[in-house]
């Protein structure tokens, strides 16, 4: 399976961690997610690490939510404007740009403490969640939520990150 072409914009120094190669960690996790949803074409995306002020600003402007959040997804192809990717399936150079994630490590860290999950698990949960949104998954309706959280849980489990007892049906489980 081809790697995902990820462009990083790190406004907070998250990737400067000397203890872990986050880019490799993220790539391995997202390749599992890509495989789980049956995507075999080339993908490109951006991941932006932002502080709480920037997360709050984006969340307020685009989602009308007056607080910082862990991840915000901006899918390139969504709804009526989607293109038929079948026309490009035989083009080995075509990369589907799925969109942009804005992640706030400090909110993820706070959530990991609130939920008792640990940072790795919460970060994995959050980035897979955003990746699935970029690929058209949602959790507004119960059947959509069950599918999305089921995929999310399987990917986390396959990666060795802990699950809650009802992770495969209910998301965070708390």
From Swiss-Prot:
Function, in words: Single strand-specific metallo-endoribonuclease involved in late-stage 70S ribosome quality control and in maturation of the 3' terminus of the 16S rRNA.
EC assignment: 3.1.-.-
Family listed: Belongs to the endoribonuclease YbeY family.
Native organism: Lactobacillus acidophilus (strain ATCC 700396 / NCK56 / N2 / NCFM)
Location of this chain's protein in the cell: Cytoplasm
Keywords attached to this entry: Cytoplasm, Endonuclease, Hydrolase, Metal-binding, Nuclease, Ribosome biogenesis, rRNA processing, Zinc
Name assigned to this protein: Endoribonuclease YbeY
Protein residues bound to Zn(2+): 129, 133, 139
Pfam families attached to this UniProt entry: YbeY
Main location group: cytoplasm
Domain of life: Bacteria
């Amino acid at each position: 399976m081809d790697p995902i072409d990820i462009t990083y914009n790190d406004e907070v120094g998250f990737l400067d961690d000397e203890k872990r190669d986050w880019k490799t960690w993220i790539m391995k996790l997202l390749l599992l997610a890509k495989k789980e949803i049956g995507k075999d074409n080339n993908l490109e995306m951006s991941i932006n690490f932002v502080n709480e002020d920037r997360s709050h600003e984006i969340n307020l402007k685009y989602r009308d939510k007056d607080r910082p959040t862990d991840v915000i997804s901006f899918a390139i192809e969504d709804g009526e404007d989607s293109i038929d990717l079948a026309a490009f399936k035989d083009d080995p150079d075509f990369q589907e740009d799925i969109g942009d994630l804005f992640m706030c490590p400090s909110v993820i860290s706070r959530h990991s403490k609130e939920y008792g999950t640990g940072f790795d698990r919460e970060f994995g949960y959050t980035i897979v969640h955003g990746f699935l949104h970029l690929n058209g998954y949602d959790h507004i309706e119960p059947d959509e939520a069950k599918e999305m959280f089921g995929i999310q849980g399987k990917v986390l489990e396959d990666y060795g990150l802990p699950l809650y007892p009802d992770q495969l049906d209910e998301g965070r489980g708390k």
